[in-house]
Design a protein with these regions (language model features):
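Sec-dependent signal peptide cleavage junction
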Residues: 8-21
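Beta-sheet-dominated interaction scaffolds and their linkers
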Residues: 28-62, 66, 109, 181-193
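Short, solvent-exposed loop/turn segments enriched in Ser/Thr/Gly
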Residues: 38, 49-55, 117-120, 132-138, ...
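Short solvent-exposed strand-capping/beta-turn motif centered on an Asx-Ser/Thr pair
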Residues: 59-64, 75, 129, 203-209
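Terminal connector regions
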Residues: 64-91, 125-174, 252-292
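Intrinsically disordered, low-complexity Pro/Gly/Ser/Thr-rich segments with frequent PxxP/GP/PP motifs
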Residues: 90-130, 220-254
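Membrane-proximal extracellular "stem/stalk" segments
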Residues: 172-307
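C-terminal membrane-anchoring or membrane-association module
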Residues: 310-334
Length: 334
């Protein structure tokens, strides 16, 4: 379970099981050069060549001593169209000049006594050259368990929650907005969640954050006949990052041959649109390889049939039991 105090939506999102207490919390100590004082993440106006200390306060609300690992990471974009600050193996664009994790001191592991607070300092080394837009990253915070704790958890059958938190950090040298710019790099077959899919590689090549945009895609054959259409809402893309956007599609709709992907990106306020296109080709070898990896459609329908038959069978058993009980009651009454 992860708690976000990040920038991908400009808010705080918390999800937790009601019966489980969160063992610790983390708070950004807001400095004087914070631009937006109403948010719980770092939004810093910085000057070139300076060094700055940023502080995160960890509060151990549990009854035991804990170790907390805090790792600075550069913001990237997941296949779901969300911002990731946890250090997942995702791609940034080639024109990303400064990675957040390279500008911050190394990750730290700190021990905190029960029911106490501890301040953890990180040093930001701001680039000597002025940069446009924003540099975006975050501090990924999670509990570090020792070997004994891990072994103990492995021996238990129960499912346990692992809590983690993210505090976002946005660096900028001015408040000027940078024009957004996108590129459609490559379109290829692949799998998503085990299903046969078409994957479009979309680059946000500007140092600006994309929040809650819509992405519409249309696949055409070379005769401009529409093969498939997709639309996703609420897409967020980190600055200078690549969004590998997957869409599930039936394999029989994409036979080997040449196609065109038409893509429209629209801003949240509907005021700006970007139209991109890319020709792509599907080979027999590529399609066969992806089909071998994907869940066969026959297997999916068989599962549905088994589920339906099982439900009907249980329904008939319950109905039969009810009839037998009613007959017994009638016999007793007689």
């Amino acid at each position: 379970m992860m708690i976000f105090m990040a920038i991908a939506g400009y808010g705080l999102s918390v999800c937790a099981e009601e019966d489980q207490a969160i063992p610790y919390s983390a708070t950004a100590i807001i400095p004087e050069n914070q631009l937006n004082k109403n948010v719980s993440y770092f939004d810093l106006l910085v000057s070139k060549g300076e060094k700055q200390i940023v502080t995160i306060q960890i509060n151990n609300s549990s009854n035991k001593k804990i170790k907390i690992k805090i790792t600075p990471n550069t913001a990237k974009t997941t296949r779901n169209g969300t911002i990731d600050y946890s250090g997942m193996d995702l791609k940034n664009t080639d024109n990303l000049k400064y990675q957040f994790d390279k500008l911050v001191s190394k990750e730290q592991v700190v021990s905190i006594e029960p029911h106490t607070k501890k301040n953890v300092d990180f040093v930001l080394s701001i680039p000597r050259e002025e940069f446009p837009g924003i540099i975006l990253g975050g501090f990924y915070i999670r509990e570090e368990k020792d070997e004994q704790q891990v072994e103990s958890l492995n021996k238990t059958v129960q499912i346990t929650n692992e809590f983690s938190m993210v505090i976002g950090c946005q660096l900028r040298m001015n408040e000027e907005k940078v024009p957004k710019d996108f590129q459609l790099n490559k379109v290829k077959l692949g799998t998503y969640g085990g299903y046969f899919s078409i994957i479009s590689s979309i680059s946000n090549v500007s140092p600006s954050l994309v929040s809650f945009y819509s992405v519409e895609k249309t696949i055409q054959d070379m005769n401009r006949k529409e093969i498939a259409k997709f639309k996703k809402e609420g897409i967020s893309i980190a600055p200078n990052s690549i969004y590998e956007a997957p869409d599930k599609i039936e394999a029989n709709k994409l036979n080997p041959g040449k196609y065109k992907m038409l893509l429209t990106i629209e801003s949240r306020d509907k005021k700006n649109k970007w139209r991109l296109s890319e020709d792509f080709e599907i080979t027999s070898k590529e399609k066969k390889g992806v089909q071998n990896e994907a869940i066969p459609s026959t297997k999916i329908s068989n599962r549905k049939i088994i589920y339906l038959v099982t439900c009907i069978w249980f329904g008939l058993v319950i109905l039969l039991l009810m009839i037998l009980l009613l007959r017994k009651r009638r016999n007793r009454d007689r």
